[in-house]
């Protein structure tokens, strides 16, 4: 098994992902939202790039009699006309269960759609990090951790999340790590904790200044969720792998 890391969505080369498994991370907050919404019973999550596409998809599904919720952000704030912002704490079971969630965010949904040439696209966060690691131990193809980043820039929060999952994989599986994957693993293993490490991150402080401390605490919590989610044919659903994941 070989493991690599891409540092932001701007560095994604869709063609180079052919034959590989992409693991997309937007820890603060898109993949944490996706993980939470599906864990709480959402039928599926549909990540789209533009706001216009989100409304078009919502109208299409509603015309078929489907229940739809719109979630996402621009500049970390709720989009006009959407049901939810990009706060995972809003996606409660009593609200999302059995419904389709259409999401559009600045970084995460863009990164997901840029990975469409990969053989498989897995959605990861700190919340389900160990479950993702256990799932990936059964794969032999090259794994590329795709950090969504912040507006095309490197984000230490996504890097830390990738390092955490890589570290978990390496506990049980021998892997060949690229230099950047080794660095992510080392940074994670050398830190005092995920939230402690990312407190100086630019995006962390943008969210903190907006009063979203509870989101930050939640998104930094390891292994609340023991499920794995795959982006396939434009939709994210729970993986039906037959692999038993024990947390």
Swiss-Prot record:
It catalyses: (2R)-O-phospho-3-sulfolactate + H2O = (2R)-3-sulfolactate + phosphate. Transmembrane segments: none annotated. It comes from the Bacteria. Its EC number is 3.1.3.71. GO terms for molecular function: 2-phosphosulfolactate phosphatase activity; magnesium ion binding; sulfopyruvate decarboxylase activity. Its cofactor is Mg(2+). It is an enzyme of class 3 (hydrolase). Pfam families: 2-ph_phosp. InterPro entries: ComB-like, ComB-like_sf. Keywords: Hydrolase, Magnesium. Belongs to the ComB family. This is Probable 2-phosphosulfolactate phosphatase. The gene is comB.
């Amino acid at each position: 098994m070989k493991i690599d890391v891409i540092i932001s969505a701007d560095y994604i080369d869709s063609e180079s992902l052919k034959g590989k498994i992409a693991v997309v991370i937007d820890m603060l907050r898109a993949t944490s939202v996706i993980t939470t919404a599906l864990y709480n019973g959402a039928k599926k999550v549909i990540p789209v790039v533009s706001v216009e596409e989100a409304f078009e998809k919502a109208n299409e599904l509603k015309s078929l009699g489907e229940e739809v919720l719109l979630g996402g952000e621009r500049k970390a704030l709720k989009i006009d006309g959407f049901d939810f912002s990009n706060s995972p704490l809003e996606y409660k079971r009593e609200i999302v269960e059995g419904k389709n969630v259409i999401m559009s965010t600045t970084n995460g949904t863009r990164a997901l759609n840029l990975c469409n040439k990969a053989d498989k696209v897995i959605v990861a966060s700190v919340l389900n990090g160990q479950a993702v690691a256990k799932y990936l131990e059964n794969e032999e193809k090259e794994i590329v951790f795709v950090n969504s980043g912040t507006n095309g820039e490197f984000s230490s929060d996504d890097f830390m999340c990738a390092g955490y999952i890589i570290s978990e994989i390496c506990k049980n599986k021998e892997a060949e790590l690229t230099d950047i994957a080794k660095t992510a693993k080392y940074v994670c293993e050398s830190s005092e904790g995920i939230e402690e490490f990312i407190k100086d991150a630019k995006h962390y402080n943008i969210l903190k200044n907006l009063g979203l401390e509870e989101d930050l605490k939640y998104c930094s919590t390891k292994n609340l969720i023991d499920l794995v989610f795959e982006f396939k044919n434009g939709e994210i659903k729970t993986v039906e792998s037959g692999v038993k994941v024990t947390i």
